[in-house]
Amino acid sequence: MNPNRNYYPQDTFFRQALDRRYRTASIWQALFLSALLIAIISLTALLYNVVDGAFGFVAYEYKKDPATFTSKPLNELTKDDLLVILKDNLSSGAYTKLDNEQPMASRSQADLYSLFLERLVQIDTKDTWSMTDSILRGAEIRAEVAEKYPDAKLEFRSWLTPQFLVSPMSSRAEFAGVRTAVLGSLWLVGIAILFALPIGTGAAVYLQEYAPKNWLTKIIQTNINNLAGVPSIVYGMLGLAIFVRVMEPLTSGSLFGVMDSNGRTILSAGLTMGLLILPLIIINVQEAIKAVPDSLRQAAYALGATRWQTVWHHVLPNALPGILTGSILALSRALGETAPLIIVGASTFISVDPSGPFSKFTALPIQIYQWTTRAQSEFHAIAAGAIIVLMVLLLTLNTTAILMRNRFQRKY
């Protein structure tokens, strides 16, 4: 080797190469930033579109003048006043039916007032406007209402109200709520997690800690990964064939003396959703177990622990944050599914709350779908309110997953 020869790059060549590296890095940084901005803009547009539909002007008329039922202003009616008005003006059959559903005397003033407007006064919604139009075109909308509907009242309304959350389904958008749908969704995810979590955890523990690494295990693992990507409608068809038809005596409740139902119950739907999230839970639990340092296992074996003792006392406690996080995120997917529930037999219109696993049911995504397909604009407005409720439920689940992961996470 010649000691006088310079093997280092020349200053000009070095600077050119360095400039190219910085230029390439800047381009990729700009691309990554652009991707982030596109994602933020898309999510913001989605949220704005939903919120925009949940608030705005509403033009409505009373089919019957409230003065024919009471001389008091509507905002001064007490609970006792409303009870007397409803009893005097509703037919005996209609009043008895309402009283059987829930005793009239135990209903709140807001509930009685809604019944008064729905059954007696009968609000007729003429038109609705989005929040943006209501703000930017307020004067134009008022003039339009005065010309088209001279007897109509115009008010800025939030369709997402406490009454909306506690009211059942109704054929009139002004009185419809999401209570029945929310309860149905909670029943569904409860049954799904009770079915899928124990089975998924057990399968993942066996595959990761006990199963021999041979061709059969690889085939099973590959199929589990494939099942996680199968379209949800396929699980709906599977649930229809197995839980609704083959297992009808169990899922309908006839084995337990329930004779007014068939296999299209909330139990069938919950088990179907459990099948849907089962591959996800198995994969998530496996990944959580893989993240546990192998040194913990070796230390337990060195102290004389059996494989079961090692798994129960060391592996699972350390994998718990990942197991909980993955399971809750899997529930988030189940909460937003629609296609399997429609195939299994969910109701698109039902006003009776589910009272057990053998009840008829609906779910929040199905309710949203049913409202968005209606021609009346007021149903689109309450669909936007229901979407906000669904997003809040999903956000709650995701936040719970993060908090539980941080609470139980262990650092090594």
Predicted regions and their residues:
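Membrane-topology segments of multi-pass transport proteins
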Residues: 1-31, 37, 45-175
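Transmembrane alpha-helix signature in integral membrane proteins
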Residues: 38, 176-205, 327
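Membrane-interfacial helix termini and adjacent extracytoplasmic/periplasmic loops
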Residues: 157-176, 211, 235-275, 345-346, ...
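Transmembrane-helix boundary motif in ABC transporter permease subunits
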Residues: 192-224, 237, 402-407
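Transmembrane alpha-helices
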Residues: 284, 293, 307-345
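C-terminal transmembrane helix and the adjacent membrane-cytosol boundary/short C-terminal tail
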Residues: 286-294, 301, 328, 369-412
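Glycine-rich helix-loop "coupling/hinge" segments at transmembrane-helix boundaries
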Residues: 334-377
